[in-house]
């Protein structure tokens, strides 16, 4: 029983950690590109901003779905025997 | 569960706040169980849906071309924002007559349901415990979850609704024959050998869009609500550090959560428009 809980805790940590790596790199690249583009063409700043927020949400989606599932594992543990 | 004798432990408190009020009286065991109806999610989504429709109706009925009040101002702002987005994505004006108001309602509805997350964690559940106990039930079993969008069945239900809308527009715009033809020829071209692959790709595309659309809203709201519960645990330590930690961490997370709430409602609306828009263009 303790093994199951230990592995579930490890799994939850890995899910959140690896997901965070992907999401942060993705948003970092997109943010830098957005700043570059708005520096180069300030008039497009508004249009690009709504698209940036939409994409930020989409990039975060996989990460936060993972966080949701990892927290479900942690608290409403389906693996208990 | 927490017997009368001692206060709930940390994990009991968290699990108590994660359990839905459903018709079976205890938490849902297996992942998919069609017999379980989450009464609290249904209640809050229907009440907030009615509130959304009422607010938008009141704004529309009292709209004056003269000097608009603040209430009319914000509704106009919303309508213009949604109309611009819809104009950019859904190109057929005829179906936009239905889709743009739908997008506006979805945005305001999900925003208000998400905003329930900003209420203190124990406010409504504690009131419900009082009512439940007054009704003769055992307060320890009075479960309630206030945020309807943090319920996977609610968000997947919404995204399935969007899927049905997409299927309707696919058939309406392309006709059943045109759509079935597209199902078998879409990504890789019109060659009999490719039919199974094309069909599999189309099915995967529809399923992936619907599941990710629903799970994204669920993941964000579930994680947000859970962090509020964990911060509340900080306060329950009844120490000076715990109390101020609860107040500071809670307000920081609430301020950040306002962005998440608006962003997730905006994204759900945008994707509704994008998916319906995709149903119009042939591949």
UniProtKB/Swiss-Prot annotation, chain A:
One of its GO terms (molecular function) is lipid binding. Its main location: membrane. The keyword Transmembrane helix applies. The chain crosses the membrane at residues 7-27, 53-73. GO terms for cellular component: plasma membrane; proton-transporting ATP synthase complex; proton-transporting two-sector ATPase complex, proton-transporting domain. It is found in: Cell inner membrane. It holds the Pfam family ATP-synt_C. It is a multi-pass membrane protein. The keyword Phosphoprotein does not apply. Keywords: ATP synthesis, Cell inner membrane, Cell membrane, CF(0), Hydrogen ion transport, Ion transport, Lipid-binding, Membrane, Transmembrane, Transmembrane helix, Transport. The record marks 60 as: Reversibly protonated during proton transport. It comes from the Bacteria. F(1)F(0) ATP synthase produces ATP from ADP in the presence of a proton or sodium gradient. F-type ATPases consist of two structural domains, F(1) containing the extramembraneous catalytic core and F(0) containing the membrane proton channel, linked together by a central stalk and a peripheral stalk. During catalysis, ATP synthesis in the catalytic domain of F(1) is coupled via a rotary mechanism of the central stalk subunits to proton translocation. Key component of the F(0) channel; it plays a direct role in translocation across the membrane. A homomeric c-ring of between 10-14 subunits forms the central stalk rotor element with the F(1) delta and epsilon subunits. Belongs to the ATPase C chain family. F-type ATPases have 2 components, F(1) - the catalytic core - and F(0) - the membrane proton channel. F(1) has five subunits: alpha(3), beta(3), gamma(1), delta(1), epsilon(1). F(0) has three main subunits: a(1), b(2) and c(10-14). The alpha and beta chains form an alternating ring which encloses part of the gamma chain. F(1) is attached to F(0) by a central stalk formed by the gamma and epsilon chains, while a peripheral stalk is formed by the delta and b chains. This is ATP synthase subunit c. It comes from Azoarcus sp. (strain BH72). The lineage of its organism: Bacteria, Pseudomonadati, Pseudomonadota, Betaproteobacteria, Rhodocyclales. The gene is atpE.
């Amino acid at each position: 029983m303790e093994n199951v809980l230990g592995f579930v805790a490890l799994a939850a940590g890995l899910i959140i950690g690896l997901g965070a790596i992907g999401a942060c790199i993705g948003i970092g690249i997109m943010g830098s590109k957005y700043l570059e583009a708005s520096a180069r063409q300030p008039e497009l700043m508004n249009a690009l901003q709504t698209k940036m927020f939409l994409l930020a949400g989409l990039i975060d989606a996989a990460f936060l779905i993972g966080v949701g599932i990892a927290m479900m594992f942690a608290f409403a543990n389906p693996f208990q025997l | 569960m927490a017997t009368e004798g001692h206060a709930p432990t940390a994990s009991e408190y968290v699990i108590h706040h994660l359990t839905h009020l459903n018709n079976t009286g205890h938490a849902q065991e297996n992942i998919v169980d069609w017999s379980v109806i989450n009464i609290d999610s249904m209640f809050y989504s229907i009440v907030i849906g009615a509130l959304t429709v009422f607010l938008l109706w009141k704004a529309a009925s009292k709209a004056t071309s003269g000097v608009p009040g603040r209430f009319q101002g914000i509704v106009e702002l919303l309508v213009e924002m949604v109309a611009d987005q819809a104009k950019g994505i859904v190109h057929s004006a005829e179906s936009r007559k239905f889709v743009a108001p739908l997008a506006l309602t979805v945005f305001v509805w999900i925003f208000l349901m998400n905003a329930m997350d900003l209420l203190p964690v124990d406010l409504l559940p504690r009131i419900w415990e009082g009512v439940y106990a007054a009704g003769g039930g055992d307060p320890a079993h009075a479960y309630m979850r206030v945020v309807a969008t943090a319920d996977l069945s609610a968000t997947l239900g919404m995204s399935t609704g969007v899927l049905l809308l997409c299927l309707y527009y696919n058939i309406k715009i392309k006709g059943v024959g045109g759509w079935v033809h597209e199902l078998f020829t879409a990504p890789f071209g019109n060659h009999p050998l490719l039919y199974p692959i094309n069909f599999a790709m189309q099915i995967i595309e529809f399923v992936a869009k619907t599941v990710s659309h629903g799970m994204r809203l669920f993941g964000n709201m579930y994680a947000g609500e859970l962090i509020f519960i964990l911060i509340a645990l900080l306060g329950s330590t009844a120490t000076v550090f715990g109390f101020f930690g609860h107040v500071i961490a809670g307000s920081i997370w609430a301020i950040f959560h306002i962005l998440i709430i608006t962003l997730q409602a905006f994204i759900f609306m945008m994707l509704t428009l994008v998916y319906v828009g995709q149903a119009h263009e042939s591949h």
